[in-house]
Structures are given as C-alpha cells and as structure tokens.
Swiss-Prot record:
Written domain comment of the UniProt record: The RxLR-dEER motif acts to carry the protein into the host cell cytoplasm through binding to cell surface phosphatidylinositol-3-phosphate.
Encoding gene per record: Avh238
Taxonomic lineage of the native organism: Eukaryota, Sar, Stramenopiles, Oomycota, Peronosporales
Residue interval(s) of motif RxLR-dEER: 44-68
Keyword Secreted carried by entry: yes
Organism expressing this protein natively: Phytophthora sojae (Soybean stem and root rot agent)
N-terminal signal peptide: 1-21
Coiled coil (UniProt feature): none
GO CC annotations on file: extracellular region; host cell cytoplasm; host cell nucleus
Primary location: secreted
Known role: Effector that, due to the lack of a histidine residue at position 79, is not able to induce cell death in tomato, tobacco, eggplant, potato, or in A.thaliana.
Record localization: Secreted; Host cytoplasm; Host nucleus
Protein name (record): RxLR effector protein Avh238
C-alpha cells in the first residue's frame, strides 16, 4: 500500500511540473461560459442565456414579463394581513374546542372507569374523579 501511495505522489509531482498540467488545470470553455454571468442579467441570474436550451429559456422581454410590485406597500399592511390570517386560524381552533373538550372528558372517564374496574381506585375515588370532570 505504501508503494502505491509513493507512486501516486510521484505521478502528481511530475504532472504538476509538465506542460500537460497547464491543459489539465484550464477549464473547459463550456464550463467557464456557464459559470460567468453576463452583465445584463446580473439581477436575473436565474434566467438562461443559452439559446440551445429552449426548455429553460426566459420569455422575450416585451415589457409584459417584468417583475410585479409587491401587493403590500408597508410592514403595517403585512402585519395586518398576518393578524387576519392568525385570527381565522384561532377562530377555527376555538370552534373545535367543544368537540376537543368532549373527547378529552370521554377519554378521562374511560380511564377512571378502567382504573376502578382493575381495582386501582376505590368507589369513592371514582365518584370524586367523575365529579371533577364536569
């Protein structure tokens, strides 16, 4: 294993000093072109500049494809909209509270009766527990 390591190090040293190393270190023209963002599309670097790739090409800039202004003009409008959405969510939760409460009481009653049936609690404890559930 050491011999293979030393051979690999020697090949790397010779490759670095040879003229072929310059060719290996240069990027392929296609890769370099993909990495460079043209000056006109710096704001919109996600748009494709290559005309060969029609699937990802951006539509022609006819003035209709410009980015639209946001719907909200201030933070107070955004906060108001978020508050409205939160209140709708809270009202849905509060609307379901009766069903949630009834379900929890039924589960607690079943647990108390199961504990009484198995002898873990007395009749008096069962009555006190059921009275607290009301």
């Amino acid at each position: 294993m050491r011999g293979v390591f030393f051979v690999a190090v020697a090949v790397a040293i010779f490759a670095r000093s040879s003229a072929e190393a310059k060719l290996l270190s240069e990027a392929a023209p296609g890769l370099a072109a993909d990495a460079v963002i043209s000056g006109e599309s710096r704001e919109r670097f996600l748009r494709v500049a290559d005309s060969e790739d029609d699937d990802l090409a951006a539509p022609a800039d006819d003035g209709k494809t410009e980015e639209r202004a946001p719907k909200f003009k201030s933070l107070s409008e955004i906060n108001k909209k978020l508050d409205e959405e939160v209140m709708v969510h809270v009202s849905k939760i509060l609307g379901n509270m009766g069903a949630i409460h009834a379900d929890n009481i039924a589960k607690a009653r079943a647990a108390l009766e199961a504990a009484h049936k198995s002898g873990d609690i007395t009749d008096k404890q069962l009555a006190a527990g059921l009275a607290k559930l009301v």
